[in-house]
Amino acid sequence: MFGSSRGGVRGGQDQFNWEDVKTDKQRENYLGNSLMAPVGRWQKGRDLTWYAKGRAPCAGPSREEELAAVREAEREALLAALGYKNVKKQPTGLSKEDFAEVCKREGGDPEEKGVDRLLGLGSASGSVGRVAMSREDKEAAKLGLSVFTHHRVESGGPGTSAASARRKPRAEDQTESSCESHRKSKKEKKKKKKRKHKKEKKKKDKEHRRPAEATSSPTSPERPRHHHHDSDSNSPCCKRRKRGHSGDRRSPSRRWHDRGSEA
């Protein structure tokens, strides 16, 4: 009554398996194959859905709180613009780049200088006292050398005068040694520049001499030839030839006339 049913299945959901998709040639056509049927050594043994796990719901500020914060900031800005409120300036620290720029302006290396040696960093309090900078100390500071400026200058006290007398010769010795070293380095630089300048002059002179010699060498053997030709022209044989040619150059009528007169 009923025909024989064919074997096999229709491929329902119960017959589907992602492991079979891995070996299928058309696996790229299956939706979600990169997560459910990963192929390759970079996907094996890794959690490919890590981005969807461990997320805690972050409760941000409500709309009313945001509006209140904006209004407060606008009110403070208005008061500062009208002059009713002082603006709080946050001090910015000196970064490494700024420190290097300051050292370059002073004319020294940043490694040789310290922060306490730079001018304009911080201010001394009133209790420290007045700092005296002599002419030599100022010169040393311009050269980028360390100057001891932490001693006080007070009118009274024998101990302070003795300490200052001890410190002065040290500073003077430092400045003298620094000046001498600076002069020596300048002299050496000048000598090197002079040597380089002399070498360059010698090279230029050699280069100028070479083309002059090259141009003068081919013209030298031609000169005696011209002199030889002139000497030949001045010889008596050449003079006779010239006379003969000059006589032959006369017109034929003149020649016949001369012959008739001779006859």
Curated annotation (Swiss-Prot):
Give the Phosphoserine positions (modified residues).
S123, S127, S164, S216, S217, S220
The chain residues annotated with the modification Phosphothreonine are T215, T219
Q: Does the keyword Phosphoprotein apply?
A: yes
Q: Where is the composition biased (Low complexity)?
A: 117-132
This protein's superkingdom?
Eukaryota
Keyword Phosphoprotein annotated: yes
The protein's matches in InterPro entries, at most eight in alphabetical order, are given as:
MMTA2_N, MMTAG2-like
Q: Which residues form a coiled coil?
A: none
Key words, A-Z: Isopeptide bond, Phosphoprotein, Ubl conjugation
The annotated crosslink position for Glycyl lysine isopeptide (Lys-Gly) (interchain with G-Cter in SUMO2) is K22, K104, K113
Q: Where is the composition biased (Basic residues)?
A: 183-209
Q: Where is the composition biased (Basic and acidic residues)?
A: 105-116
Start-end of Gly residues biased regions: 1-11
Q: Which GO terms describe its cellular component?
A: extracellular region; ficolin-1-rich granule lumen; secretory granule lumen
Q: Which Pfam families match?
A: MMtag
Residue ranges of the region described as Disordered:
1-21, 105-132, 148-263
**Where does the secretion signal sit in this chain?**
none
Cite a single GO MF annotation: RNA binding
This one is known as Multiple myeloma tumor-associated protein 2
Name the species this protein comes from: Homo sapiens (Human)
Organism lineage: Eukaryota, Metazoa, Chordata, Craniata, Vertebrata
